[in-house]
Amino acid sequence: MTNMRKSHPLIKIVNHSFIDLPTPSNISAWWNFGSLLGVCLGLQILTGLFLAMHYTADTTTAFSSVTHICRDVNYGWLIRYMHANGASMFFIFLYFHIGRGIYYGSYTFMDTWNIGILLLFAVMATAFMGYVLPWGQMSFWGATVITNLLSAIPYIGLTLVEWIWGGFSVDKATLTRFFAFHFILPFIITAMVMIHLLFLHETGSNNPSGMNSDSDKIPFHPYYTIKDILGVLFMMIALMSLVMFSPDLLGDPDNYTPANPLNTPPHIKPEWYFLFAYAILRSIPNKLGGVLALAFSILILMLFPILHLSKQRSMSFRPLSQCLMWMLVANLMILTWIGGQPVEYPFIIIGQLASVTYFFTILILMPSTALMENKLLKW
């Protein structure tokens, strides 16, 4: 008699995805982030569900309802801070996951990569709308500034912005619809994750060498299940340390002031994980140009498969490309720092230089270095 996990229609799918999945024997800890992102998503949906039970999406009571969650609901403070800091963990892992994909050439799995980029956009949209919900000063002004960027779109811009707002400013209608979208998007993300995995399992995982690993595969369980559990353990230690000891470390103090349309905060800025894109947006002194640069800073990921000119898939054996990769990482850190600084000298010029370097590295330096490496290896 066949084992139930191999014959049952539903359990069979789980078996082929997480138990008997043939996996390269040499994948490193950089391959842990997929499962960590899955755990993060589950955690966010769970904590978010409990928060939604006590939250009210109304401009007059939203701020007080969050205060009520933290003060009166049993372990409400824990749920709230796990949700807020869980989002930060989510983005840390997302950026590591994408960085891993770039370093090891995983973007050659075109379907998986493109669905991944769509997932990134969906997660960014969800996080942005979630930041608006507590209805603090930074929530309100962040929503106003970011939605207002759409008015840069020629001809339909203004109509589009007012349509999103549901009025002539960010108000009750905006908050209600943002809550509705913030609630539904994680479930859409979950469905997209399944498609992401479906495409990945069509080809099988990449590995650090970038070479075909069909001749050396091992079952996912128990080898990688135990490795993933260790990753989850480290993640939970990091997350709970953050939640218990400094829950507001990554937040903005301005968001502890209720939203006031008559009082603008001195520095309007998004959460830390959007600062690199915000710096690119601010580095161009033209509204439409800034919006296009902002969009392209993420959309540029779609060009990686086209810009891959090396004969080798992975960067493991390409020291020059490795230098550029780490230069890009340092550049993104500089952009993140600049995004949180006021718009004044010398931050303006540093931001502009870092933005130019970001695009120049990806579009010109990396492909030309790949060609040079081919030449050096007489390929």
Swiss-Prot record:
Record's signal peptide: none
| Molecular-function GO terms, alphabetical | metal ion binding; ubiquinol-cytochrome-c reductase activity
> Where does the protein principally reside?
mitochondrion
Per its UniProt record, what Gene3D superfamilies does this chain match? Cytochrome Bc1 Complex, Chain C
Q: Where does a ubiquinone bind?
A: 201
Its localization reads: Mitochondrion inner membrane
Chain sites annotated for binding heme b b562? 83, 182
What cofactor does this chain's UniProt record say it requires?
heme b
Pfam families tied to this protein: Cytochrom_B_C, Cytochrome_B
Q: Could you describe the subunit structure of this protein? A: The cytochrome bc1 complex contains 11 subunits: 3 respiratory subunits (MT-CYB, CYC1 and UQCRFS1), 2 core proteins (UQCRC1 and UQCRC2) and 6 low-molecular weight proteins (UQCRH/QCR6, UQCRB/QCR7, UQCRQ/QCR8, UQCR10/QCR9, UQCR11/QCR10 and a cleavage product of UQCRFS1). This cytochrome bc1 complex then forms a dimer.
Family (UniProt):
Belongs to the cytochrome b family.
Entry protein name: Cytochrome b
